[in-house]
Amino acid sequence: MKVYLVGGAVRDSLLNLPIKDRDWVIVGGTKEILLKKNFQQVGKDFPVFLHPETHEEYSLARKERKSGRGYTGFHTEFSSDVTLEEDLIRRDLTINAIAQDENGNYIDPFQGRKDLNLRLLRHVSESFTEDPLRILRTARFAANLMHLGFHIDKDTMILMCKMVKKNELLYLTKNRIWNETEKAFKTLNPHVYFQILHACKALNFIFPEIFFLYERRTFFSILFTNFYSISFLSIGLSKISTLTKDVSIRFSYLCQFLSEKIDFSSTKENYDDDSAKLVKKLCKRCNIPSHIEELAVLNTGFCVFLSSIHYQSSSNIIKMFSKIDAWRKPDRIYKLSFLCDFNLFYHQNKIDNSKLKTGFLKKCFFIIKDISVKKILNQGFKGYQIKNELNKLRVNKLKFWRMKKKCFFFKE
């Protein structure tokens, strides 16, 4: 029985990147042998075992035969006769099909180390086409390794296009799609993920709303040269990803481009309900976690309002705080404030940013968040009067602070 380190750990080690997880393949082993060594079996589709001390994953070498459609349509064989090369050939990319033995020697039958040096994402074999999830994985690897100069091999891209054309993507589950997309959003260049999906014609199947951004760029670039330019979106998504690792903020930034009512001269409250519903529909369809969905919907709905936050009345700002339930969920304010600041100072040709201060939305909330209801109750207010009086106190306190700090750009 021989044990080999495989996959991402070998790849990342060769690239001098931090190793997140170490996965192992066992050749010549059996389920019975591992259980006797106190390994814990997990996984339903094929035997994966957790090491009794390190809890790292060990898999029996296996080979696969296509038996149906989609990523689940496989017959898997994991007998002790399966060779290491038979296990490696079923993997997606050559850079993920490198093994290392206990002495540090590399087993690399598909030239993965050469492709690492060439900065090339290349499929291992024609069996790449048997699993549609590999389209998303390859796009995600392109995003994850872009800063190192990696690109997708042209023949691999041709295979990806053929897979899309055969409607293989229809067999992917919502959770699988989001899991890969979330990983892509955690990379340094998440925009590359969407660019690759668009290039291989997969974006329309998976995210038709985002696909529309690419398709409408020609018309809207005439009206909104910077904001609706897809290159502007990509650069912005890349830039904001250098400032925060929060997936909900990165995703919300992308979704705001779905708003069709962006107008940097507007001073109305103007909640964009249609665009907010579009984002909500996207999130529901893809089973996107609720905390990410909520921020994306709010940021898109209030995109117009937030783009002119310094010019809004104190009354309208308080109304917005109430609508987003800021009193019970203050974390929303901090994230929306981050997005607001980024948008205002990134769109420098739209607003005279020399007049504006960062963190304005957050400061407004901080000024009025601790106004107590007890004082209002002690004054004898009842029922609906309590809410009205509390709102009045908040508005007046915010007005006073803004006058003192000269944070008005219009007459209230």
Curated annotation (Swiss-Prot):
**Does the record's keyword annotation contain Magnesium?**
yes
- Cofactors per UniProt? Mg(2+)
Keyword terms: ATP-binding, Magnesium, Metal-binding, Nucleotide-binding, Nucleotidyltransferase, RNA repair, RNA-binding, Transferase, tRNA processing
Q: Which SUPFAM superfamilies match?
A: Nucleotidyltransferase, Poly A polymerase C-terminal region-like
Residue positions annotated to bind ATP are 8, 11, 91, 137, 140
- Identify the residues that bind Mg(2+): 21, 23
Q: What is its EC class?
A: transferase
| Catalysed transformations (reactions) | a tRNA precursor + 2 CTP + ATP = a tRNA with a 3' CCA end + 3 diphosphate; a tRNA with a 3' CCA end + 2 CTP + ATP = a tRNA with a 3' CCACCA end + 3 diphosphate
The protein's matches in Gene3D superfamilies, at most eight in alphabetical order, are given as: Beta Polymerase, domain 2, cca-adding enzyme, domain 2
Q: Which residues bind CTP?
A: 8, 11, 91, 137, 140
User: What does the protein in this record do?
Assistant: Catalyzes the addition and repair of the essential 3'-terminal CCA sequence in tRNAs without using a nucleic acid template. Adds these three nucleotides in the order of C, C, and A to the tRNA nucleotide-73, using CTP and ATP as substrates and producing inorganic pyrophosphate. tRNA 3'-terminal CCA addition is required both for tRNA processing and repair. Also involved in tRNA surveillance by mediating tandem CCA addition to generate a CCACCA at the 3' terminus of unstable tRNAs. While stable tRNAs receive only 3'-terminal CCA, unstable tRNAs are marked with CCACCA and rapidly degraded.
Q: Cross-referenced NCBIfam families, in alphabetical order?
A: PRK13298.1
Add the further remark from the entry: A single active site specifically recognizes both ATP and CTP and is responsible for their addition.
Can you name this protein?
CCA-adding enzyme
Organism of origin is Buchnera aphidicola subsp. Schizaphis graminum (strain Sg)
